[in-house]
UniProtKB/Swiss-Prot annotation:
Protein name: Bifunctional protein FolD
Signal peptide start-end: none
Species this protein is from: Cupriavidus necator (strain ATCC 17699 / DSM 428 / KCTC 22496 / NCIMB 10442 / H16 / Stanier 337)
Molecular function in Gene Ontology: methenyltetrahydrofolate cyclohydrolase activity; methylenetetrahydrofolate dehydrogenase (NADP+) activity
Gene (name only): folD
Family: Belongs to the tetrahydrofolate dehydrogenase/cyclohydrolase family.
Main function: Catalyzes the oxidation of 5,10-methylenetetrahydrofolate to 5,10-methenyltetrahydrofolate and then the hydrolysis of 5,10-methenyltetrahydrofolate to 10-formyltetrahydrofolate.
PANTHER family referenced in this protein's UniProt entry, alphabetically: C-1-TETRAHYDROFOLATE SYNTHASE, CYTOPLASMIC, C-1-TETRAHYDROFOLATE SYNTHASE, CYTOPLASMIC-RELATED
One example of a Gene Ontology biological process annotation: L-histidine biosynthetic process
Description of how the protein assembles with itself and partners: Homodimer.
One GO cellular component term noted in the UniProt record for this chain: cytosol
Keyword Amino-acid biosynthesis: yes
InterPro entries (UniProt xref): Aminoacid_DH-like_N_sf (IPR046346), NAD(P)-bd_dom_sf (IPR036291), THF_DH/CycHdrlase (IPR000672), THF_DH/CycHdrlase_cat_dom (IPR020630), THF_DH/CycHdrlase_CS (IPR020867), THF_DH/CycHdrlase_NAD-bd_dom (IPR020631)
Functional pathway: One-carbon metabolism; tetrahydrofolate interconversion
Length: 283
């Protein structure tokens, strides 16, 4: 029997409607949640992501501002703008769209965002808080993946989980969240000799590498949950993930599609993080 789909669009819609209600209650108290988005340069993919984030804010009763800058913006000018947003009481979340042009130090920029407004969860203070089990913000993509696992009531305590990919944005925080939920976690990276040797024993596989068809049916334990974070293009230019969807679907118990899986959840959890920041600021 084919795996049950975990529909990211449907789950995102449900969480967004709850977020919109909470946002409306805050707005009534004079604390409308506000997200500031900064885009530097003309990267086409970044423009799409930013547009989707701003639209999600508008559709759910959040205030949003979008600062677009040319690719030759100086690092000093960007840091000055971030500092102004740090001081703005109407802004509860600050998001700098990555990647940034090469002459700008991304690490320095992310560290300039006030930790209480770092709704991406990338600031070193928030990364450290995640490590100790008391995060102010969970990074949006791993947070969305955890909500998807929660939606199918998958018992993570004692489960074996394998995260394929060790990035600071997805892989590492994903592993920490799974660990905190009681799973036994293995992280595979580009140096891992035989990824399949790890994934074949896993109850949960999270693929977050950016390499299409990396996870095939013979690498998946029957009945496992497979979360596909990858965003790639096939030979026809069609969106696909890191998982061979057609093959793995015949083996897994649950699987997320691409598109329509993790993607909508990432933006949804950005709204949730912004909302939580606004609620903390409102007291």
């Amino acid at each position: 029997m084919p795996a049950q789909l975990i529909d990211g669009n449907a789950l995102a819609k449900q969480i967004r409607s709850e977020a919109a209600l909470r946002a409306a209650r805050l707005t009534e108290r004079g604390h409308r949640p506000g997200l500031a988005v900064i885009l530097v340069g003309e990267d086409p993919a970044s423009q799409v992501y930013v547009r989707n984030k701003v639209k999600a804010c508008q559709d759910n009763g959040f205030h949003s501002s979008l600062d677009r800058y040319p690719a030759d913006l100086s690092e000093a000018e960007l840091l000055a703008r971030i500092e102004a947003l740090n001081q703005d009481p109407n802004i509860h979340g600050i998001l700098v769209q990555l990647p940034l042009p090469k002459h700008i130090d991304s690490h320095k920029v992310l560290e300039a965002i006030a930790p209480e407004k770092d709704v991406d969860g990338f600031h070193v203070a928030n990364a450290g808080a995640l490590m100790t089990g008391a995060p102010l913000f969970r990074p949006c993509t791993p947070y969305g993946c955890m909500k998807m696992l929660e939606s199918v009531q998958f018992p993570l305590r004692g489960a074996r989980a394998v995260v394929v990919g060790a990035s600071n944005i997805v892989g590492k925080p994903m592993a920490m969240l799974l660990l905190q939920a009681g799973a036994t976690v293995t992280i595979c990276n580009s140096k891992t000799r035989d990824i399949g040797a790890h994934t074949r024993d896993a109850d949960v596989v999270v693929a977050a590498v950016g390499k299409r068809n990396l996870i095939t049916a013979d690498m998946v334990k029957p009945g496992a949950v497979v979360i596909d974070v990858g965003m790639n293009r096939d030979d026809n230019g069609k969106l696909c993930g890191d998982v061979d969807f057609a093959g793995v679907r015949e083996v897994a118990g649950y699987i997320t599609p691409v598109p329509g899986g993790v993607g909508p959840m990432t933006i949804t959890m950005l709204l949730v993080n912004t909302l939580e920041a606004a609620e903390r600021a409102a007291g």
